[in-house]
Amino acid sequence: MELNKIYHMDAFEGLKNIPAASVDMVLTDPPYGTTENKWDMPIDLEALWKELKRITKSNAPILMFSQMPFTAVAVMSNPKMFRYEWIAEKGNATGFLNANRMPLKAHENILVFYKKLPTYNPQMEKGSRTLEAKVEAREIMAIFAL
């Protein structure tokens, strides 16, 4: 397959054309199977993992967008390689048709899988909400420490 070229084809057929251990990172947003739309049919995760394991280098991260309940299915499809998740805040919430029955969905999960630890360059901001939350968590834990 030619580098930096977009191919319109079945994903599994395309994956077969990628050489083994040649991919530095995978970023995928597979169908979640949470709607009745034709394009949202679940894919064979076992077959996907077989190809992703074959084409990725040993330290290549595999980042997979997901949303519950697909998140649970995706994690359990490869618990050995699952490491952690990131939360991506959406600019616009979805799920307005069900707004009378449940909260709108304002985030997606990004699941992080890998075989060996990839290069990670932390991005930190002083005073970010995440940092503040960690401080609060430490303070709460200190209250319960006997």
Give, region by region, the residue ranges found by the protein language model.
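Core catalytic lobe of class I
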Residues: 2-146
